[in-house]
Amino acid sequence: MSNIGKITQVIGAVVDVEFADGNLPNILNALVIKNPNNADCPELICEVAQHLGDNVVRTIAMDATEGLVRGMEVTDTGNPIMVPVGSASLGRIMNVVGRPVDEMGDIDAAKSLPIHRPAPEFNEQNTNVELLETGIKVVDLLIPFPKGGKMGLFGGAGVGKTVILMEMINNIAKQHGGISVFAGVGERTREGNDLYHEMKDAGVLEKAALVYGQMNEPPGARARVALTALACAEYFRDEENQDVLLFVDNIFRFTQAGSEVSALLGRMPSAVGYQPTLGTDLGGLQERITSTTKGSITSVQAVYVPADDLTDPAPATTFSHLDGTLVLSRQIAELGIYPAVDPLDSTSRILDPNVVGAEHYSVAREVQMVLQKYKDLQDIIAILGMDELSDEDKQTVARARRIQRFLSQPFHVAEVFTGTPGVYVKLEETIKAFRGILNGEYDHLAENDFYMVGGIEMAVERYNQRQQAA
């Protein structure tokens, strides 16, 4: 017999439900409310968050609560939110509760999984380290991606996090050919729509599952949609032994949704108004994103940085979970250098000669040294000008400016608004080109020859065209 309760109170996204004696649903159980007053959401799913006493549970709604009234019947499903997984989810867009939102009919999955699951045991985890090529020069050279690892793209508003993420989806999904899962967490619906059509045009959609809970969704959906995507990815890793790519845009919105709900649940706010359970919430998600002996989940996460402050509790808590951090800088974006990656602030755990090889490591470190020297000299240049520098410093500055421009790159996904065709650059070409710049082989080329090119041969070609024209 089903367990039925009644609504006693509705406050925004939080719904209180009273059950009979001894029939309280477990924490994290999904409850279903038939809501005939709301045509957009006739069946609302809520998740139990707290037991308040007096047989009342406090729940978080996964959709709009308009039309709910006190006394409505609520049914306990007896399980957490269950979402369809497996090949039926590929090429489709679903919401937080696993319902399709692409108007292409139901998702006929043979299996459903709960969105809340324990992280893999320590002895099931895989510790092999391997580099994953992205085709983006600055990333492959200075911030190499570990296969089966977690990378974060940190940046303030409008510095290009989503564009880099989309380029990685385009490059890695095409080259890697495996299965991708994309979680749109509290971002623009327009970007979700663009991504769907880009993946369709690129022919990678049939190998991707998309899970959206965008900006207009209630906080309950935004706080759980990343877990829905993770359940899809875990199925491919554990049951089908696949190497899966998990893209999350934006992990900050997951935290933000948690803080919106936290106050409604009556918890005391902690630093900067965030929920007191910030570390636990994020840890519960991040610990499940890992490689096991069966397969791997490689995750790329965009992290919004409020007011460009990396010490804000949300980005600061995220840092500790990641294998690599790709920090996007507004100063570099202002120079017109895209991707606006800060090569001195970004780090990767696998930039190690034992993993990437001695040549790659030495080129990467020398590039960083030249850029750091240029940064140190900038105050002197600003006050006294270039003429006051020694010949050696002048050469360092000239090479640093060439390196800085060569770290820019035209993207496939930005082709629509730049008009420049995107380029995928192989890792060995990247290392060879930067070694050449460091050794002075390209000192005769102008700085602008290096701007927005793919391989070094494109820069040389620009120089040759100029020489012929002259």
From Swiss-Prot:
**UniProt keyword Nucleotide-binding present:** yes
What this protein catalyses is: ATP + H2O + 4 H(+)(in) = ADP + phosphate + 5 H(+)(out)
Using the record, list the residue span of the signal peptide; answer none if the entry has no such feature. Answer: none
Q: Which domain of life is it from?
A: Bacteria
Query: Which residues does the annotation say bind ATP?
Result: G155, G156, A157, G158, V159, G160, K161, T162
Keywords, A to Z, come to:
ATP synthesis, ATP-binding, Cell inner membrane, Cell membrane, CF(1), Hydrogen ion transport, Ion transport, Membrane, Nucleotide-binding, Translocase, Transport
Q: Which GO terms describe its cellular component?
A: plasma membrane; proton-transporting ATP synthase complex
| Cell location | Cell inner membrane
Top EC class per UniProt? Answer: translocase
Q: How does it sit in the membrane?
A: Peripheral membrane protein
Q: What family is this protein classified in?
A: Belongs to the ATPase alpha/beta chains family.
Protein name per Swiss-Prot or TrEMBL: ATP synthase subunit beta
The organism named in the record is: Oleidesulfovibrio alaskensis (strain ATCC BAA-1058 / DSM 17464 / G20) (Desulfovibrio alaskensis)
